Regions:
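Active-site loop/oxyanion-hole signature of alpha/beta-hydrolase fold enzymes
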Residues: 41-78
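Gly/Ala-rich beta-loop-alpha elbow adjacent to hydrolase catalytic centers
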Residues: 80-85, 89
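Conserved small/polar residues in nucleotide/adenosyl-binding loops
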Residues: 252-255
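Conserved alpha/beta-hydrolase catalytic His-Asp/Glu region
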Residues: 114-116, 132-185
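Conserved serine/cysteine hydrolase catalytic core
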Residues: 172-210
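Catalytic histidine-centered segment of alpha/beta-hydrolase-like enzymes
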Residues: 223-236
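Flexible "cap/lid" loop of the alpha/beta hydrolase fold
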Residues: 94-95, 100-131
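Conserved HGGG/HGGXW glycine-rich cap/lid loop of the alpha/beta-hydrolase fold
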Residues: 4-50
Length: 255
């Protein structure tokens, strides 16, 4: 993995888990608005790191925890996960011994997919991600609701380093067809599973609500997948800070 940090390591820590097909730097626009108050940690999965080998989710978590330990992080003010980053974040939350005060999932991909289906879809995912590199972001509109120039560099960088073997290994132990991992009721009370009302991942909301009945499942009406985060990183960052500091979501920040 590769790690970027923003802010003073003495401040409360916020750990980001990025979406599929992008690098950890995709959280930079949000982290830059938090860095005055928080220590932001942005890991990039080994899947998108040149010369690195993806082993397993457990190994990814080990690398994250090793980095947090080296940085002197003893607790996390918040874990923020976007799209498929939810899969790794959930594994982290259920395995880490570090206290986690809040968690926020933005359009989490809480899919439960059979092994055979994951294996079949891997070549298509690989081609889609690599095509973003080959076309310098020109094919983004074909796989996402927007093709903003501001986010293309993160897709291009990820596609450049992606290997088929690493993606195949990641898909072999991601989005597995099994019950969601358990979260304590106390952590659920401080966890937010947010979905945009018009995004495809909205279909996972009911299953999430049933698995984590004490959690919060806000809906951003009229918003697409990760739209608030992409189009208004400042507002998104302010919302995260409000959750961390007031333990509630500030709906006035979402218009």
């Amino acid at each position: 993995m590769l790690f970027q940090t923003y802010g003073d390591s003495r401040n409360p820590a916020v750990l980001f888990f990025h979406a599929m097909g992008v690098t950890g730097a995709s959280s930079e626009p949000v982290a830059k608005y938090l860095q005055d108050r928080y220590f932001c940690i942005l890991p990039t999965s080994t899947v998108y790191c040149a010369g690195q080998k993806y082993v397993s989710k457990a190994d990814e978590i080990r690398q994250v925890e090793d980095f947090l330990h080296r940085q002197g992080v003893e607790r996390l003010a918040m874990v923020v996960a976007s799209s498929i980053g939810a899969d790794l974040a959930m594994a982290f939350l259920t395995q880490t011994k570090l206290p986690v005060e809040h968690a926020f999932f933005d359009g989490g991909q809480f899919a439960q997919i059979g092994k055979g289906t994951r294996r079949i879809t891997t070549p298509f995912l690989y081609f889609a991600i690599k095509s973003l590199y080959w076309s310098k972001g020109g094919t983004l509109k074909k796989i996402l609701w927007c093709d903003d120039d501001s986010i293309k560099p993160y897709f291009i960088a990820a596609g450049e380093n992606l290997t088929y073997t690493n993606l195949r290994r990641q898909m072999a132990d991601s989005l597995e067809y099994k019950p969601f991992p358990p979260l304590s009721k106390e952590l659920q009370k401080h966890t937010y599973f947010e979905f945009g009302s018009i995004e495809d991942h909205f279909k996972y909301r009911q299953a999430v609500m049933e698995a984590y009945p004490c959690g919060h499942c806000p809906v951003f009406e009229g918003y697409n997948h990760m739209q608030y985060q992409i189009r208004d990183p400042k507002g998104f960052a302010e919302m995260l800070a409000h959750i961390a500091e007031c333990d509630c979501i500030d709906r006035k920040s979402v218009v």
